[in-house]
Regions:
Chain B
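Conserved, structured core segments of small domains
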Residues: 1-115
Length: 429, 115
């Protein structure tokens, strides 16, 4: 970092990402006004763009921004006598806290955590929670959020306005929930982060490069929460889960085509990242409070540390699914368990477990795609083609559609004719 | 912060209860209501007669009134009571609503105070 000086706007972008949530949180706490806080952060960023290119990037850019924002806040508030108490707070904090600001003392850690719990308050709808979290904690611009979700910027702006209005008018508090509420409220936060992650991870098709990588944003947010709440095993579990997914991201596409787990070139996985994520997961598990994210991460860790699809410890994976099914008794978990059973006890056993799920999962393309694969393996080719056809009708994702179309073109005769065989060539990865 | 808490429930299920069950449930609600009032969290409020007693008056732009038998909307869950709350914030209002002793649905909404 010290050798080649980086352009000021690049440093600014990085710094803003790291500091925006921190600045906004501190200012919301002091001012009690969300919009004003964001405006001040924006003003401070503009001031930085004016000064830094000529005067050089300050040694502590976060502290510089915080000071600039506070000074502007004081200027603005001086016009109104009723803000005297807030001005006093601002002045006191400018002189007392500045040296430590960007190193993240416990006080401003609390600020961001409070703000995050407000963003993910259950009284806000899911879309608002997602937009608020990305904007205020993640430091994304409204336009960037719009691009990521393929939604017009004005729609995101509307959601933010409405959410902030509800926070103000319904008096949604700005605090970390107490111990009794914490499990449910933290689960809500983690749901929002995982939703952002999945939006990025599942939607990425390897060809929409201009679309922002929300999966990386979500991973950054989860790592922030893990830093702020290091004793919550589910937070660490979610972070490990995201990192295990991201460690395999490179191998998910070959020439723009989706490559499924059995066919991925495991040499392209980031094995150092996998080791770190597994270590993180083990740390979470030692805390002795199991939960859905730790279990999902444990399943993924089994896959990520196996030398090949065939050498995967399917007995352990089925056992982990049995635990997960108790924590989260959903048909999707049962479907995934059935797929592990297919490897342990064969496709016939798995098909039997799949049939009762038809009613609840019949509208989901992955149910039909999974069923098609199993049918092909037991030689029921015609039914397999029908199931793949149904899956194709139900998905818009271009990479998934291509994969299904290839399968259908192969006629569903044998596992060898499916894309799985074709993708295994030495240069495919 | 003042909120209006609307309490809605399944009237048919209420009707289907035995007298003993109804008495027990009234006792729970009365005890709860008294505790919240004593703590200053409930400012005022009332139970309402069943929705079969409701009358809806709808006014058009010219001020002409149409009077119709029944509540605003016909639904499975009908408004059965309300309370005006005085609590610090939405979390406190949600906590209060969450402690309501019957299997009902509650809506909490801030009241517009001063202009």
């Amino acid at each position: 970092m010290a050798d080649a000086p980086r352009p000021a706007d690049e440093v600014l972008a990085d710094t803003l990402r790291e500091e925006r949530g921190r600045l906004t949180a501190a200012l919301v706490r002091i001012l009690g006004d969300w919009d004003l806080a964001e405006e001040l952060v924006q003003d401070a960023a503009v001031a930085a763009l004016e000064h830094w290119p000529s005067e050089g990037v300050p040694r502590n850019p976060g502290a510089w921004l915080m000071t600039a924002a506070r000074r502007r806040a004081i200027d603005r508030l001086r016009r109104h006598a009723r803000y005297r108490e807030r001005i006093r707070l601002l002045t006191a904090e400018v002189t007392q806290m500045d040296p430590g600001v960007a190193t993240g003392g416990p006080m401003d850690a609390d600020d961001r955590l409070r703000l995050l719990f407000t963003c993910c308050h259950p009284a806000l709808n899911r879309e608002a929670q997602v937009a608020l979290t990305l904007k205020t904690i993640g430091g994304l611009e409204t336009a960037a959020i719009g691009r990521a979700f393929l939604v017009p910027e004005t729609t995101i702006a509307q959601r933010l306005v409405r959410a902030k209005r509800k926070i103000r008018d319904a008096a949604i508090p700005y605090r970390v929930p107490d111990l009794a509420e914490l499990p449910a409220r933290l689960a809500e936060v983690l749901t929002v982060l995982y939703l952002i992650f999945n939006e990025g991870y599942l939607a990425s098709s390897g060809e929409t490069a201009e679309r922002r990588d929300l999966a990386r944003d979500a991973e950054w947010l989860a790592s922030l929460v893990a830093r702020l709440m290091p004793d919550e095993p589910e937070v660490l579990g979610l972070l490990a889960l995201m990192r295990l997914h991201l460690a395999r991201a490179e191998a998910r596409f070959a020439n723009g085509d989706l490559v499924l787990l059995p066919d991925q070139d495991r040499r392209r996985w980031d094995h150092a990242a996998i080791r770190d994520a597994v270590a993180l997961l083990r740390r979470a598990e030692r805390m002795g409070r199991v939960g859905t994210y730790q279990l999902q991460a444990a399943i993924l860790a089994e896959h990520a540390t196996a030398d090949s699809w065939a050498e995967t410890r399917w007995d352990r994976i089925v056992a982990l699914y049995d635990l997960l099914r108790r924590v989260e008794p959903t048909p999707v978990v049962r479907l995934n368990r059935a797929l592990a059973v297919a490897e342990l006890d064969g496709p016939t056993a798995a098909l039997a477990e799949l049939e009762p799920l038809a009613e609840r999962l019949g509208g989901w393309h992955l149910y039909h795609a999974a069923r098609a694969d199993l049918l092909r393996r037991v030689g029921r080719a015609e039914e397999a083609v029908a199931a793949d056809g149904r899956a194709l009708e139900l998905t818009d994702n271009p990479a998934e559609r291509r994969l299904l179309q290839q399968r259908l073109a192969a006629g569903g005769v044998s596992p060898g004719a499916a894309p799985r065989g074709r993708r295994n060539g030495p240069r495919a990865g | 912060m003042k909120y209006l808490m609307l309490i809605a429930g399944d009237e048919a299920a209420w009707e289907a209860q035995t007298d003993a069950e109804r008495t027990a449930s009234y006792a729970r609600v009365v005890a709860w209501w008294r505790a919240q009032t004593d703590a200053g969290r409930i400012v005022s409020g009332h139970e309402l007669q069943p929705s079969s007693t409701a009358t809806t008056v709808r006014l058009d732009r010219d001020g002409r009134a149409t009077v119709v038998d029944g509540p605003f909307v016909e639904a499975k869950e009908m408004l059965g009571g309300y309370a005006v709350l005085d609590v610090p914030d939405l979390d406190a209002a949600i906590a209060l609503a969450s402690s309501w002793p019957e299997p009902d649905t509650l809506e909490v909404r801030p009241i517009v105070t001063d202009g």
